[in-house]
Amino acid sequence: MTLRRALGVLGAVVALKGAMVITARHRALAVVPSELRHPALYVPLNFGNAAVRAIARQAVPLTGATIRPGVRVERCTVPATATNPGVNLLTYQTAGRHKPGGALLWIHGGGTVLGAARQENAWCSRIAAELGVLVVGVDYRLAPENPFPAAHDDCYRALRWLHDNATDLGVDPELIVVGGESAGGGLAATVVQRAHDTGVPVRFQLLEYPMLDDRTVLRLDPHGSSVYTWTPASNRFAWNAYLGRPPQERDDRPYIAAARRADLTGLPPAWIGVGDLDLFCPEDIEYARRLREAGTACELRVEPGMYHGADALLDGKAPAMTAFRTAMLDALSAALIEP
């Protein structure tokens, strides 16, 4: 076979494979409700690619830049210790909020490999404005440069800082909620577990399509399709980066992944929301089931036709996503009402 013919055959194979991928993508996207279709669905990204990750690290923090009028945003730092660096925080509050009142520690998403607290400016300032509470965002260290337990430790130290400074911050320590989205939701769940073990009060956990179980990577056919925003390839890279090694069936490191904890007894009430097209849907449903089985009140919302991150893309544009976020706010508001 001549070189020209070999290249021609190779080109035909690549073209055929590309056509098959495009066909599969369009077939998968056909199940997404028309109101939830967004250009992001047509641009699958592999965050295992260093160049893609570098660009995303610059772009993602800008996605939530808008701050609600009347909300003051300030930078704070959890002091460094002999073994840990300082942790940068953003606080959001209105001038007239009730003191002492409730507080939300909110942990951003990004697979533990992307993101920053400021990407949640719009969401955190909305909560501060509408509920009149203090919101604290955490700039935790990212993987793979900083594998476990770096991000977990940073978020737990932020919770301890919130408790230690509750009086100065105008916060009731009995009204502190921990929450987050995606990887931030998974970190929130492990922080809540550690807080329970160390006697640090947490009122409620607000988990938005949380990334809870590294063993999802080990499944041959993870729930959902590889074409919806957060893909199996990105999930595999993110867990490898966070764990510092590929996931294994057995991993006894405490707080490594929320779903690995055997005993969920005594954890605070929870709200878990996820879309039925989200790769995390099965692990989130299972965690909610186990919380309930352990005696913890847990409201589970599984949104039909919703893929990972759809609410952030379409809040205020698609009624279903506006309702999803409103449900989160309602759950948080109810949790912060004193008994």
PLM ranges: what are they?
Residues 58-62, 78-80:
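Short linear interaction segments
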Residues 62-63, 120:
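N-terminal glycine-rich cofactor-binding segment
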Residues 66-70:
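Short secondary-structure junctions
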